[in-house]
């Protein structure tokens, strides 16, 4: 099945990730910058909240900080996507049982090297109330029958920072995080849950488009493609799983055309960005 998505927000022709993710998570369009609120700042019930009432378990996965707009729209209600102090608290207190990505700095106060302006050491609160994961190896060592809420913060900011390659070996790929979330969700089903929902965001595809960086873009598309393949493999095996692959907006105006315009049969192509 294929379809067309109209990505405009409530108050602009060009959307941002907050309003577009809110449209996906709630079924309602809203103003740019808003998360889980309508155009009048009234709280909208999101998908993870709705299905929790019916006995389903949810997971959120992102290669950005978990407080970034797309994952936040599925677990937070704030009027501006930049209010990360509020977003991180919302996500910690949400009913989403598995949240994986980057963003440790948004759980620590500025005096401890973090980015929280409220002075709260939320990382310590996560440790005391839930299970905190900080390295990729902890995914494979996790006991799946542990029913704690799991928050994985595998980097101070986003995952696999192109300027910090030495950290990459400690940070999971999208497909590794998805495998963990699927296996954990299946364990929850064994323990009585009716089913599960997993949102996976290839966050940095957008950033590579902003940077007009084709090598960065190819790396992120490869990472996302592997996660999609994992999802499809599981769906074929399970026979009762819906996989939706979509985007909230385009970035960069990427053009792919024949390297030799006069020869449309040539295998070589060239890439260019238009915005």
Language model features with spans:
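A post-motif C-terminal structural segment
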Residues: 1-22, 68-275
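Mobile, glycine-rich extracellular loop/lid and propeptide segments
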Residues: 24-25, 29-30, 38, 44-45, ...
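Surface-exposed loop and membrane-interface regions of Gram-negative outer-membrane beta-barrel proteins
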Residues: 13-20, 30-39
